[in-house]
Each structure stands twice: as structure tokens, then as C-alpha cells.
Amino acid sequence: IVGGAECVPY
């Protein structure tokens, strides 16, 4: 969990 794929769909 670092890229942000689990936070935002961008």
C-alpha cells in the first residue's frame, strides 16, 4: 500500500 491504488482510483 504505497502507490495509492487502495486510496484513490487515480
From Swiss-Prot:
One of its GO terms (biological process) is proteolysis. Optimum temperature is 55 degrees Celsius. Active from 30 to 65 degrees Celsius. Optimum pH is 8.0. Active from pH 5.0 to 11.0. It comes from the Eukaryota. GO terms for cellular component: cytoplasm. Disulfide bonds: none annotated. Residues 1-10 form the Peptidase S1 domain. The keyword Cell division does not apply. GO terms for molecular function: serine-type peptidase activity. Its EC number is 3.4.21.-. It is found in: Cytoplasm. Keywords: Cytoplasm, Hydrolase, Protease, Serine protease. Inhibited by the serine protease inhibitors Pefabloc SC, STI, aprotinin, benzamidine, leupeptin and antipain, and by the cysteine proteinase inhibitors DTNB and pCMB. Detected in muscle (at protein level). Serine protease which degrades the myosin heavy chain but not actin or alpha-actinin. Selectively cleaves Arg-|-Xaa bonds. Belongs to the peptidase S1 family. This is Myofibril-bound serine protease. It comes from Saurida wanieso. The lineage of its organism: Eukaryota, Metazoa, Chordata, Craniata, Vertebrata.
